[in-house]
């Protein structure tokens, strides 16, 4: 009897130390996997519900979630009121005179490195004047564009932030041409003619105001900043009247209106929603680690305050 009990105890110990232990471990592992998957599924469902509720708030706010909706969100402008079309026409004329803006850049660089006492300044003034005379047709278009209050550029939203729209380049060239024109007026003692040039520079920058893109709003701010660099160059080559300084101050102040950046964030959010929900709709998808949670309508209200 005692021998039988010892034999049974030895079998139990062998079971727990061998195959039995492995079986228990396997069961525990499977239970852990099931628990992990169940938790992951619960978290995924919770996240989906959160995203669905966010989309509902976005829809209620009348904001877009697809490229088609984003295209409608960027206000349409009749051709006869669209400054963007006139800027495009001006750029075609300017490219025929100064391809890629090389001459304007060189003349501005020379001016920015000059001072009032430079002996070469009169010669540079004549060179600038001769170049500006060739740009008369361009100025006609730029002056006409400045009278139009709205602008809408042809932009393909599905391309996303991987390609710069064509109008970024030609707007910069037109803006720097107006900057050169303002500095030339100051050099010739016609400081009262500088203010209209600065106003056209401002109008050109503000033509990007409604574009729902962060890149466009950053460029808009950079283009507004060109007025500051214009003032710096003007102070190097001339004594400015108080009225001229007042014009620079009035036209160089940055607006505190957050609405353009709110629109830009709406556009960026729309792009990334498309990236993750319908990646085939994107021209080229940038490699990004994750999508940032951009402002929902409640966050935008806070931003506007």
Regions found by a protein language model. Name each.
Residues 2-305:
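Short acidic linear motifs
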């Amino acid at each position: 009897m005692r021998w039988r009990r010892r034999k049974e105890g030895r079998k139990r110990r062998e079971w727990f130390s061998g195959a039995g232990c492995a079986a228990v471990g396997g069961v525990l592992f499977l239970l852990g996997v099931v628990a992990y998957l169940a938790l992951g599924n619960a978290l995924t469902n919770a996240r989906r519900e959160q995203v669905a509720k966010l989309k509902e708030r976005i829809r209620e706010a009348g904001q877009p979630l697809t490229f088609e909706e984003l295209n409608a969100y960027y206000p349409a402008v009749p051709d006869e009121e669209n400054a963007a079309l006139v800027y495009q026409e001006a750029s075609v004329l300017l490219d025929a005179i100064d391809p890629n803006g090389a001459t304007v850049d060189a003349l501005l660089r020379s001016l920015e490195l000059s001072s009032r006492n430079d002996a070469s300044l009169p010669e540079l003034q004549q060179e600038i004047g001769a170049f500006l005379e060739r740009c008369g047709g361009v100025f006609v278009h730029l002056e006409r564009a400045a009278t139009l209050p709205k602008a809408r550029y042809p932009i393909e939203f599905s391309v996303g932030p991987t390609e710069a729209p064509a109008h970024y380049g030609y707007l910069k060239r037109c803006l720097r041409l107006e900057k050169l024109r303002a500095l030339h007026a100051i050099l010739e003692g016609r400081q009262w003619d500088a203010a209209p040039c600065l106003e056209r520079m401002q109008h050109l920058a503000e033509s990007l105001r409604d574009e729902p893109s962060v890149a466009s709003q950053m460029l808009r701010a950079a283009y507004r900043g060109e007025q500051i660099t214009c003032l710096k160059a003007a102070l190097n080559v001339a004594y400015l009247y108080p009225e001229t300084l007042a014009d620079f101050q009035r036209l160089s102040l940055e607006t505190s209106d957050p609405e353009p950046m709110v629109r830009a964030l709406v556009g960026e959010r729309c792009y990334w929603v498309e990236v993750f929900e319908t990646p085939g709709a994107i021209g080229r998808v940038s490699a990004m680690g994750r999508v940032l949670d951009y402002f929902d309508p409640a966050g935008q209200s806070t931003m506007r305050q």
